[in-house]
């Protein structure tokens, strides 16, 4: 027929309701709010087009490739119950659109360009189905849940952590002292705050040295393995790796990274280094609410959590369900399972849009952190189960008798809750009795 220039509706090419999804497709569920007068089919097709092979007009070079093989397809649209003019649009992407082992490229393709789109009032990526064929191109977490338990020799209970406060302003020696007191009192881990990197009042090398000293002293006195999440996040990837190398030379068990501000490329590099050198990797999600807070625009945290499991991390902050940063319980448990389990069934009541098979990619320990304290312990033990890290910052350091007694209180409460649970008592009902 020859080439025919001109602008045509996206839905003629990219809306394909009879498409059968392939096992190798990456599937996305978008919450689409079209501008007034834009039909949902056109909006959904526009998203599929702009995040795959399409552009705003027909181009001559389309004839040089097979669009049928490479285009994203909007294959199903359903209205959102209780919302006016909101639709869930399902889009299937052929696997060949993505570079192997690159979360960076996956996000650049799927969410890189479409969110500023004129035809849409708002757009939110609710979930992704990562096919096993793509999962297998990722190393994933450096070690995973089982290997971590074996390294630490801690079984049958959640792990306990504490963020050292005040987060900024302590000297390295005083910081190390706080670390020692918490670990000595019974915590498994202490943590650098996400914004502790290398500032004038405390340079990273000094902090690493004093924290290592605190760890070894506490280990010698308690006979337990201890750790402190040494934040290796830095302004350049090279500097980040340099800090991780120094941590390894000190012989400490774990380092930490802010994966959203640091970026997925840096995070994946660090995860590879950690696996090669036997370091655990704790991940903080600083900046996540910029992306996931709005209900109708941005990206749901479950997508960021899946991406982290692919990029690599052994722990990730995942909300609390109780405390100051409360999350909706079922939804939170949905992405907690996506982090830990090997296979998760589709379950819309928990916000899970697709069945996800992780094909033995190691699991990530969810970290409950943010405004929780010792009276939340029964609820946390029940909600999160054994494979989790419970992190009390002010809930440890705010104890009227000081840091070490605060740590003791948390450890005693945790042991009491685990014992009561194992004896078959009802934590939800008798929680306060148990820890009193």
Curated annotation (Swiss-Prot):
The keyword Signal does not apply. The modification N6,N6,N6-trimethyllysine is found at residue 4. It holds the Pfam family RuBisCO_large. Binds 1 Mg(2+) ion per subunit. The modification N6-carboxylysine is found at residue 191. It is found in: Plastid, Chloroplast. One of its GO terms (biological process) is photorespiration. InterPro entries: RuBisCO, RuBisCo_large_chain_AS, RuBisCO_lsu_C, RuBisCO_lsu_C_sf, RuBisCO_lsu_fd_N, RuBisCO_lsu_N_sf, RuBisCO_lsuI. SUPFAM superfamilies: RuBisCo, C-terminal domain, RuBisCO, large subunit, small (N-terminal) domain. Mg(2+) binds at residues 191, 193-194. Substrate binds at residues 113, 163, 167, 285, 317, 369. GO terms for molecular function: magnesium ion binding; monooxygenase activity; ribulose-bisphosphate carboxylase activity. Its EC number is 4.1.1.39. The keyword Chloroplast applies. The record marks 324 as: Transition state stabilizer. GO terms for cellular component: chloroplast. The active site is at 165 (proton acceptor), 284 (proton acceptor). Its cofactor is Mg(2+). It catalyses: 2 (2R)-3-phosphoglycerate + 2 H(+) = D-ribulose 1,5-bisphosphate + CO2 + H2O; D-ribulose 1,5-bisphosphate + O2 = 2-phosphoglycolate + (2R)-3-phosphoglycerate + 2 H(+). Keywords: Calvin cycle, Carbon dioxide fixation, Chloroplast, Disulfide bond, Lyase, Magnesium, Metal-binding, Methylation, Monooxygenase, Oxidoreductase, Photorespiration, Photosynthesis, Plastid. HAMAP family: RuBisCO_L_type1. PANTHER family: RIBULOSE BISPHOSPHATE CARBOXYLASE (PTHR42704), RIBULOSE BISPHOSPHATE CARBOXYLASE LARGE CHAIN (PTHR42704:SF15). The basic functional RuBisCO is composed of a large chain homodimer in a 'head-to-tail' conformation. In form I RuBisCO this homodimer is arranged in a barrel-like tetramer with the small subunits forming a tetrameric 'cap' on each end of the 'barrel'. Belongs to the RuBisCO large chain family. Type I subfamily. RuBisCO catalyzes two reactions: the carboxylation of D-ribulose 1,5-bisphosphate, the primary event in carbon dioxide fixation, as well as the oxidative fragmentation of the pentose substrate in the photorespiration process. Both reactions occur simultaneously and in competition at the same active site. This is Ribulose bisphosphate carboxylase large chain. It comes from Sanguinaria canadensis (Bloodroot). The gene is rbcL.
């Amino acid at each position: 027929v020859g080439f025919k220039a001109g602008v045509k509706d996206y839905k003629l090419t990219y809306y394909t309701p009879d498409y059968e999804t392939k096992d190798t497709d990456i599937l996305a569920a978008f919450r689409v709010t079209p501008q007034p007068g834009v039909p949902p089919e056109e909006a959904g097709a526009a998203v599929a087009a702009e995040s795959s092979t399409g552009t705003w007009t027909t181009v001559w070079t389309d004839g040089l490739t097979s669009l049928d093989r490479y285009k994203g397809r909007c294959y199903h649209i359903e209205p959102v119950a209780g919302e006016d003019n909101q639709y869930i649009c399902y889009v299937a992407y052929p696997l060949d659109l993505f570079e192997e082992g690159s979360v960076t490229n996956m996000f650049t393709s799927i969410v890189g360009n479409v969110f500023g789109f004129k035809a849409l009032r708002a757009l939110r990526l609710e979930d992704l189905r990562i096919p096993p064929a793509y999962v297998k191109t990722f190393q994933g977490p450096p070690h995973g849940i089982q290997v971590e338990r074996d390294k630490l020799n801690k079984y049958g209970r959640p792990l306990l952590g504490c963020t050292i406060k005040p987060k900024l302003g302590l000297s390295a020696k005083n910081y190390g002292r706080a670390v020692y007191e918490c670990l000595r009192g019974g915590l498994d881990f202490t943590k650098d705050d996400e914004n502790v990197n290398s500032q004038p009042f405390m340079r990273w090398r000094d902090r690493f040295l004093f924290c290592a000293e605190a760890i070894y002293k506490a280990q010698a006195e308690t006979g337990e393995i201890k750790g402190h999440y040494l934040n290796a996040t830095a302004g350049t990837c090279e500097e980040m790796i340099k800090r991780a190398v120094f941590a390894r030379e000190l012989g400490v068990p774990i380092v930490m990274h802010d994966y959203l501000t640091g970026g997925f490329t840096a995070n994946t590099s660090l995860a590879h280094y950690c696996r090669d050198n036997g370091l655990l990797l704790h991940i903080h999600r600083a900046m996540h609410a910029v992306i996931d807070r709005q209900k109708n625009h941005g990206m749901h945290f479950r997508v960021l959590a899946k991406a982290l499991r692919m990029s690599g991390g052994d722990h990730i902050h995942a909300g609390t369900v109780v405390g100051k940063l409360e999350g909706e319980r079922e939804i939170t448990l949905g992405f907690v399972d996506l982090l830990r389990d090997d296979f998760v069934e589709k379950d819309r009541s928990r916000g899970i849009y697709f069945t996800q098979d992780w094909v033995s990619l190691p699991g990530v320990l969810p970290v409950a952190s943010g405004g929780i304290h010792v009276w939340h312990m029964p609820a946390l033990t029940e909600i999160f189960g054994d494979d989790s890290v419970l992190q009390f910052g002010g809930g440890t350091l705010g104890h009227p008798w000081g840091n070490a007694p605060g740590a003791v209180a948390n450890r005693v409460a945790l042991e009491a809750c685990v014992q009561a649970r194992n004896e078959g008592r009802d934590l939800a009902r008798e929680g306060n009795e148990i820890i009193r």
